[in-house]
Amino acid sequence: MAMSTMFPKFSKKREGDNVVMEQKLLQTTNSLVLDVKECAGCGICVEACPEEAITFGLVGAARRGAIDEPAINVDEEKCSYCGVCVCLCPFSALSLRVDGEERLPIVEKEGFPQFDRTAKIDDEKCVKCTICSDVCPADAIDRNVPEFEGASESGAPRQSALKSSTAFYVDMEKCNLCGICAVVCKDIEIQRQTPTGASTKLEGEVTRITEQDCDACRVCVDICPKEAITVERTVESNRLEGTVEIMPEDCITCTWCQVTCPEEAITMDKLIEGEIEVYPEKCPGGCSTCIEICPTRALYMPEAKPASEMAGEREANVAINKDLCIKCGACVVACPSEDAIVLKRTGFHMKGKETDLYKKIMEKLCTPRTSKVKESTPGDTELKTVGEAKAA
């Protein structure tokens, strides 16, 4: 039987952590790639898709690792491969390839803006500590700093960490060439002339074999019985060499690095602005789904208050650090309760021409929304606007 030569042709396949949707045209191949691990299931792409080609999967179960399935599903035949979802994904979980090359024709033709990612580290303030890389939930910190023995057995010696110079002096008028300094330090050498019967006086010199290995520990100074040794160390810079940078495409602007930086060296603008509220009376106790799936660790279980401080109020099962929240909406999507979380986005930090398509999508994304009833089967979940919730 003859093979079909009709175009376009569509395919969808799983390749490791990626799901690849493909559209083959006569002369061009478009591919939309979803990184399953990076996708938070926030639903921005679901709402933004002009073709309504993206639907929710089992977001809570997928994000908790209970099932090995993507949090969203893309219909490869309905998808127009326009790239709008790529432009609006705060997690860079989606990418578009044209003939194997990662591109965004809709941006190239000024048909849609992109996120204006401004996060940066002031190198003059940065002391090259490890706090930002340790707290970043998105692994967006590129730390290109030499490794030393404190962090790894194979690391460089600690005395090489800072640019410095060490001066070693021996007052030969005081020195008796006893050699104790050379006994305790491998970098010091005693050169004595062989004494003869004509004179029992010792003569010679004390030298340092390798100046670069001296870490100015001053053991030789303290152990010298004649106080003949002086060691002076001059530090040229008290900063570690190397660079610590934020990788813009990976940064989700949660501000963890910014709020924990002891030198206040980090600045950034949130990708998404807005407000989010959790209503304790609607939140089911013992659930913790939103806490487990939050990509920024902004949601947490609050400490229990004494009954005397509750004043008749219901104890909250979950709390949110609004500084760390990026208003992605993943918690709203995954919440199995009704109206427990309300998200009100007010804007997206973008650069580029704000086209009619963009304005239409923004109107939808900035409509206040609340948590859905529950999730059961893929495609069954949906977000509700606040207005719909009140009318129900």
What is the meaning of each model-derived region?
Residues 1-30, 38, 62-81, 86-392:
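Flanking helices and flexible, charged tails adjoining ferredoxin-like Fe-S electron-transfer domains
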